[in-house]
């Protein structure tokens, strides 16, 4: 009966790849730092993503039969209060991600339909800019929620399609980069030298604080691995396939980012391409890929007109690829986090109707409540008077910090997990408690360090207090809400402090 519901290893790899690897992070990173982004990706990969992936591997193998995902991991490693706050914080960061993507996903849609970002020109029934994007985002979230309630089969299928197209997009970038490099006599468009790897052509990222704060963008590029943790019990042969899928994905993603950023420089001169016109974080990916098509046309001897046509085709294809990739990730994020929140945390925290599972084994009521929350946030943000560009930028900034703080909960929990010898650990990548604790501390420090720099950078460099407040307010608000919910649960069920974990019982 359950065989049809199980997820194979390669499907799981594609789901992880879709959830973690963001193709747009490649041109965005090159836009912010040039080749200087590569060392930060290497540092973040070595000190954060790879050890973090190994931690998730050990967690997943040890708790392969648990349905609660990261809540179960943290609850059994540290305690219920710590686990609830970490899970709730992580869940709310995914709400922010959904709000951001529900509006920003229309940029790749525009590139697919029109060959360039024309979202600022869109107008319908008197609505334009962030207002129109907000309305479209609301329609999208409702549609995806409806389809997702029909079962995991639909989710895994759409997520896999997204992963396939992201893979094709990366192959296109790599092969295209080689063609341009060879066609130009092995002379990269952006000169390669030692200085290029330790500095940034972007004046906003030339200071120590600016360069260090870029680390949070690298960390964000590696984010999302824990989303699939809720699918351990849905995996085919989880004790073997889940850890293998995580390790394989971690290697592909880490190496892939660094190579891809290098290849962007083969066909993109930073000063010539990324300083002309209205280049921003939302559209830079399509500008870069449009340029790739144009440069390929040039080295192959196309006429200027045909080279431009090829560039537009590349922009359209990347638009389609990113549209499908983001849609695939959306389907995973719209289900897995709410599943872990509802099935992992104590049922009595939530109203009884929220925990009901439909015939497709989906928490339908909770998913529609989640949909309503996202719709309300989108509406409030869209009609707040900000331009589309600022609207997207603020949401991206807000998501960076909110998304990475929960990683600290998991890395701290891993230290406790390694210490508890009675927990059966089928896979031990970190062979001893000491090595696990050291890497747990390193990962926690790296995340905290990057977030602090990101938070203070707007004040120090631009005197922009609003950006700082925005990045700090979200996480604080969600922690307060989490504490209130847990306190209500504890009071209602007359739990005493002895049942709380020692780490957070004093909060």
PLM region spans:
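Helix-loop-helix junctions that connect adjacent transmembrane segments
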Residues: 38-39, 121-125, 129-131, 160-307
